[in-house]
């Protein structure tokens, strides 16, 4: 009998064995929640052929098998849920069906939602109570399911720790999810903490978000999530990637505390606290990016926070003031965050290893510093100090010692302080020890930086001095002995270069310490700053080391391409710029080179077969593509701006800028006027008129900038032999003019500052040969060598009232030696002068003849504006085969003329001029020789001219008419005039015209000018037995300044015996004057030698006089500058093309010779018996 409720037997089992439970297939996380019921097995149908008697038993057995299968399926499902595999697709959610009424209660509990949504939800619920749910409820239900899925995957706890006490039951999944997601701006995708196991999911995306959640936040951006510090630590523990940037929200009710970031300063806290309540955070974050934003926008901030706080990007390098970021360092932010994450992720063992390596680096810094200081101490104690001792000072000159060990004591003092501080810190080492402040304090000191730079600048001169000193056998033996005494057998060169090599070593050690210093360590910021200072010092050292060589090479290139320019390369000379100019009144282009102490004006001519291309005058291609010829050379100290038009240029620029601003405003007003609805015709016409007028003003100002000569020209005054002459430079436009003038002023200021600095001098003393006591040094002169580049010799005369003696000293070797010493004449020597060989006129190279008056009045502008760029149109002179001679005069009226290459012998009497009166002064003047004689009130001035054969006509001197009433005591040539001192008057005599300038009375009538020295535009003089120096202008002979030296000498003698001090002060007077290297040198009867800059002596009523450490026991009688190698004294056409203070050839070295009685070094250790012996002190000025 068939049972209609039974199925057929096609699906049944034929045996009586219980059915095997089929395991439920594993569900993937990508399966939609709506398909979860499809995995339940269908009910098994019974067999249709079973009889009635077995029906009940089968049903019972079937029920038991179904219970077993259900139990097995439940166990399998739980196991599958525990081993759930996460993917990028939608996760499965095993949640019960959503209760709509519970969801409505949840929504009604929201304060903002109550007022707007309660009625709408109730109305729709009432209207749809018996039917289907509305679309909004369906959307809300889907949203709740999605949020439940998000909560499931993130496994975020649904209640805080305060709920554990039973005050609140476990929240419904929907309620907890809404509360934590809708009303929180925390990055929900990063809150993957498991409530049961307390762990994070091990799978995350590149942005730090768990996989499988991305479809819920499709518009997510990288800068909208900020994980809390707790989540950040969990992120590190599971080795996940870190977001590239974060966004923080500033809360009014709970301000974010500021913490100290050790890298850049005070910044906002990087991550918000993990203890902050989720309910206190706005719902801005998820609502703005979720696909249900339309619905969640109704859940905006609660009434307690009506305003949304602006989001501020977190930046660990920014010091925020008032909520505003002052700087952005995006790349450094990411790197700094990565550093923090990496250091926090390290284990304790790894941190211990890093701290250990950091300690080793600090120990290495200390050990290498000790070794470096020991090397410097070896230099000072074994080399420098012994070589300055009296026992060893004869090995090499003191000047070489100072040049070799320049700045070594200062460097040693700085590093001894650093070593002491490092030792104290490292001896008390711990993991939080700080060294950055020590290094920062050391390398940020300006004195230390200047010391290193000066040392590097002098380094190549120090090496050259070592080579020079090792040429002496005695020093070579001492040098080898010191090398053997050194622990590492290092020579002097290796020890001297150690300061330069030390600086990069500091940088390497500091980098090693930074590598092993945690990011949040207090020392890291200081180490970073110290590293920057060390790096800047290393770069400066390299620049100064290579810059001087590059500048020297560039000067040599300019010297090679400029025809007629020689000896341009000197120490500390640099090229500043070069420009194309035109001189006033001409249309020819000239090139002006501005150097640190010189101006060169040259002609410009393009080279043939060179394609012309428009290039900047500052480019090297411009120099290579043109030919240059020197026209004029001007010392920078001889130039001054005569007409200040820069202020006028600045005024025009201000007017032009104002007009341009007005033009922009008028155009904007016209645009706004066109929007008016009322009548605007009159206003539009007014605006058009104003705009037209303003445009014309702009055009006129632009034309004035380019065409006005006052704005594009620089008016200079150049000091020449004729006085100050105008020199107008016209530039292509006002901009280039302003740049040139600004650089010119800076160069003048720098040069004046350098001239104020006293030159460093060293000394060497020799004893002048004396045949008998009683001879006093009276006069000296410098005689050039046989060639222009050969070393000069020094001729010194000593005499008593009955005879004279001439000593010739050679300076061409390292040692100063006395070549010869011969007697000359039977009277006291009163005057001596070096006279260049006579000149003969050569033929003129142009057809037109110029009058003598025109040649005398020829100015710089005339020379540079001439039509020819080849040869000068004036009379030029060339030397004959004659030799340089030395003229020596005595009280008997005899003038001895001696060749510079001959020894002083009795046959010198063959060339002798016998005059009536005693000789008082001799001066060489433009190819002639002036000799002054006097007897009682008879004053005579004689002019000796060269003969036709090139010799001197000593038999027929020409008498020069004059108005001098007193004996002529001194004559000095400057330019085209000779300054003559007669009594208390100064006279100026023009050799070319034979005319005198009106004399000027300088001293009182009771005094007489006995000493005079002329340099540039200054005349320094003083009276007989006077301690006051007068400064007179060389052109108008007016007194500029005067000062006294008594106070400086008294201060120098303050430590001497009372009797000696009173004796020297009682008879104190100025005994000699000279000028060398822009410094005035003053010798006194007390034996003291003083010096000051010419600029100070000219401008200051009490200049800062520097007293030399070593002087003479008796009076200092002669001060004489000696240039080595000396330049020829022959007048040449180049001297006519130079300013007053430009020498014909730059000297490589300057020596100042001080001649006097005895030697006084301030130690009172000299033998008193040598106080009356003549000594010569050679000061070598660098």
UniProtKB/Swiss-Prot annotation:
Gene Ontology cellular-component annotations: cytoplasm
Where in the numbering of this chain does the DH domain appear? 357-544
Q: Where, by tissue, is this protein expressed?
A: Expressed in muscles in the body wall and head, and in the nervous system in neurons including FLP and ASE neurons in the head.
Disrupted-gene phenotype: Viable with normal development, size and lifespan. Reduced sensitivity to factors that induce neurodegeneration. Improved chemosensory response in aging worms.
Record flagged with keyword Coiled coil: yes
Coiled-coil positions: 637-669, 897-922
Return the Basic and acidic residues bias intervals: 69-78
Q: Which Pfam families match?
A: PH_19, RhoGEF, WD40_2
Keywords in alphabetical order, please: Coiled coil, Guanine-nucleotide releasing factor
Note down the stretches annotated as region Disordered: 1-96, 863-884
The organism's superkingdom is given as Eukaryota
- Identify the SUPFAM superfamilies for this entry: DBL homology domain (DH-domain), Quinoprotein alcohol dehydrogenase-like
Q: Which GO terms describe its biological process?
A: actin cytoskeleton organization; intracellular signal transduction; response to oxidative stress
* MF (Gene Ontology): guanyl-nucleotide exchange factor activity
Its function, per the record, reads: Probable guanine nucleotide exchange factor which regulates the Rho GTPase rho-1. Functions in ASE sensory neurons where it promotes neuronal degeneration under conditions of oxidative stress.
Q: What is this protein called?
A: Rho guanine nucleotide exchange factor osg-1
**What is the source species?**
Caenorhabditis elegans
């Amino acid at each position: 009998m068939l049972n209609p409720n039974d199925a057929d037997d096609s699906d049944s089992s034929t045996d009586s064995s219980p059915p095997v439970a089929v395991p439920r297939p594993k569900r993937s996380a990508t399966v939609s929640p709506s398909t979860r019921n499809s995995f339940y097995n269908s009910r098994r149908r019974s067999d249709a052929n079973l009889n009635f008697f077995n029906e009940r038993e089968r049903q019972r057995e079937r029920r038991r098998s179904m219970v077993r299968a259900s139990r097995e399926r439940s166990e399998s499902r739980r196991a599958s849920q525990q081993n759930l595999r996460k993917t990028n697709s939608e996760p499965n959610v095993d949640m019960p069906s959503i209760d709509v009424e519970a969801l409505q209660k949840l929504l009604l509990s929201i304060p903002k939602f109550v007022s707007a949504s309660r009625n709408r939800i109730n109305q729709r619920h009432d209207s749809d109570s018996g039917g289907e749910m509305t679309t909004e409820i369906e959307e809300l239900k889907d949203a709740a399911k999605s949020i439940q899925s998000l909560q499931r995957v993130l496994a975020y706890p649904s209640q805080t720790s305060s709920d554990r006490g039973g005050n609140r039951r476990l929240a419904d999944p929907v309620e907890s999810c809404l509360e934590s997601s809708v009303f929180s701006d925390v990055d929900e995708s990063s809150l993957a903490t498991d409530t049961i196991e307390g762990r994070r999911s091990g799978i995350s995306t590149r942005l730090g978000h768990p996989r499988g959640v991305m479809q819920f936040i499709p518009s997510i951006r990288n800068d909208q999530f900020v994980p809390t510090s707790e989540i950040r630590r969990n992120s590190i523990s599971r080795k996940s990637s870190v977001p590239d940037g974060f966004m923080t929200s500033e809360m009014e009710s709970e301000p974010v505390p500021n913490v100290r970031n050790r890298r850049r300063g005070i910044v906002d806290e990087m991550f918000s606290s993990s203890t902050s309540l989720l309910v206190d955070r706005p719902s801005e974050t998820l609502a703005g990016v979720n696909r249900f934003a339309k619905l969640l926008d109704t859940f905006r901030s609660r009434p307690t926070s009506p305003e949304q706080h602006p989001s501020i990007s977190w930046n660990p390098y920014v010091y925020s003031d008032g909520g505003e970021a002052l700087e952005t360092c995006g790349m450094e932010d990411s790197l700094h965050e990565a550093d923090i994450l990496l250091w926090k992720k390290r284990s304790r063992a790894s941190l211990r290893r890093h701290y250990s390596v950091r300690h080793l680096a600090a120990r290495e810094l200390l050990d290498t510093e000790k070794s470096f200081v020991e090397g410097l101490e070896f230099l000072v104690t074994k080399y420098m100090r012994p070589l300055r001792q009296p026992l060893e000072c004869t090995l090499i000159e003191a000047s070489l010692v100072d040049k070799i060990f320049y700045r070594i004591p200062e460097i040693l003092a700085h590093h001894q302080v650093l070593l002491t501080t490092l030792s104290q810190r490292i001896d008390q080492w711990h993991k939080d020890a700080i060294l950055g402040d020590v290094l920062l304090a050391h390398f940020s000191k300006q004195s230390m930086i200047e010391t290193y730079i000066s040392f590097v600048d002098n380094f190549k001169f120090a090496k050259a001095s070592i080579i020079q000193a090792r040429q002496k056998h005695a020093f070579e033996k001492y040098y080898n002995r010191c090398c053997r005494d050194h622990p590492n057998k290092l020579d002097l060169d290796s020890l001297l270069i150690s300061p330069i090599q030390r600086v990069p070593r500091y940088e390497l050690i500091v980098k090693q310490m930074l590598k092993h210093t945690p990011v949040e360590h207090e020392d890291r910021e200081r180490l970073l700053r110290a590293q920057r200072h060390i790096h800047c010092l290393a770069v400066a050292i390299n620049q100064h080391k290579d810059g001087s060589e590059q500048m020297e090479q560039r000067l040599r290139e300019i010297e090679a391409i400029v025809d007629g320019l020689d000896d341009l390369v000197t120490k500390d000379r640099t090229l500043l710029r070069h420009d194309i100019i035109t001189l006033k009144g001409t249309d020819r282009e000239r090139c002006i080179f501005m150097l640190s102490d010189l101006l060169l004006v040259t002609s410009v001519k393009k080279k043939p077969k060179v394609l012309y291309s428009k290039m900047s005058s500052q480019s090297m291609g411009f120099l290579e593509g043109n030919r240059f010829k020197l026209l004029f050379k001007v010392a920078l100290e001889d130039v001054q701006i005569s007409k200040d038009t820069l202020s006028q240029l600045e005024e025009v620029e201000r007017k032009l800028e104002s007009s341009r601003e007005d033009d922009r405003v008028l155009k904007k007003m016209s645009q706004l006027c066109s929007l008016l609805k009322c009548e605007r015709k009159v206003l539009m016409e007014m605006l058009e008129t104003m705009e037209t007028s303003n445009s014309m003003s702009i055009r006129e100002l632009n034309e004035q900038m380019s065409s006005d000569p006052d704005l594009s020209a620089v008016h200079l005054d150049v000091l020449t032999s004729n006085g100050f002459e105008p020199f107008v430079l016209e530039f292509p436009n006002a901009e280039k003019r302003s740049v040139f003038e600004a650089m010119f002023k800076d160069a003048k200021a720098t040069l004046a500052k350098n001239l104020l600095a006293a030159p460093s001098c060293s000394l060497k003393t020799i004893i002048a040969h004396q045949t008998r006591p009683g001879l006093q040094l009276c006069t000296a002169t410098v005689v050039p060598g046989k060639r222009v580049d050969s070393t000069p010799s020094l001729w010194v005369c000593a005499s008593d009232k009955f005879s004279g003696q001439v000593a010739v000293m050679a300076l061409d070797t390292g040692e100063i030696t006395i070549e010869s010493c011969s007697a000359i004449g039977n009277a006291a020597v009163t005057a001596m002068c070096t006279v260049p060989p006579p000149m003969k006129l050569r033929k003129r190279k142009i057809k037109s003849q110029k009058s003598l008056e025109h040649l005398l009045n020829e100015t710089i502008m005339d020379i540079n504006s001439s039509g020819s760029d080849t040869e000068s149109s004036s009379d030029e002179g060339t030397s004959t085969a004659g030799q340089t001679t030395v003229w020596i005069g005595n009280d008997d009226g005899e003038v001895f003329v001696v060749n510079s290459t001959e020894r002083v012998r009795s046959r010198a009497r063959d060339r002798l001029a016998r005059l009536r009166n005693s000789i008082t002064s001799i001066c060489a003047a433009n190819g002639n020789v002036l000799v002054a004689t006097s007897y009682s009130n008879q004053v005579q001035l004689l002019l000796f001219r060269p003969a036709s054969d090139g010799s001197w006509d000593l038999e027929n001197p020409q008498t020069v008419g004059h108005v001098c009433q007193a004996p002529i005591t001194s004559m000095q040539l400057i330019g085209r005039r000779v300054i003559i001192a007669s009594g208390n008057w100064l006279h100026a005599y023009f050799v070319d015209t034979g005319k005198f300038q009106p004399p000027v009375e300088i001293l009182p009538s009771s005094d007489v000018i006995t000493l005079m020295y002329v340099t540039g535009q200054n005349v320094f003089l003083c009276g007989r037995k006077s301690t006051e120096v007068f400064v007179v202008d060389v052109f108008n002979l007016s007194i500029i300044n005067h000062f006294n030296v008594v106070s400086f000498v008294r201060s120098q003698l303050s430590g001497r015996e009372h009797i000696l001090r009173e004796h020297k002060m009682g008879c104190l007077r100025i005994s000699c004057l000279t000028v060398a290297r822009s410094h005035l040198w003053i010798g006194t009867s007390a034996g003291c030698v003083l010096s000051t800059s010419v600029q100070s002596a000219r401008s200051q009523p009490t200049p800062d006089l520097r007293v030399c450490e070593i002087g003479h026991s008796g009076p200092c009688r002669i001060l004489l500058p000696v240039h080595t190698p000396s330049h020829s004294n022959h007048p040449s056409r180049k001297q006519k093309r130079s300013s007053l203070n430009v020498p014909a050839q730059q000297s490589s070295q300057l020596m100042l010779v001080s001649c006097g009685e005895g030697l006084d070094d301030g130690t009172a250790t000299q033998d008193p018996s040598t106080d009356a012996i003549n000594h010569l002190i050679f000061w070598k000025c660098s």
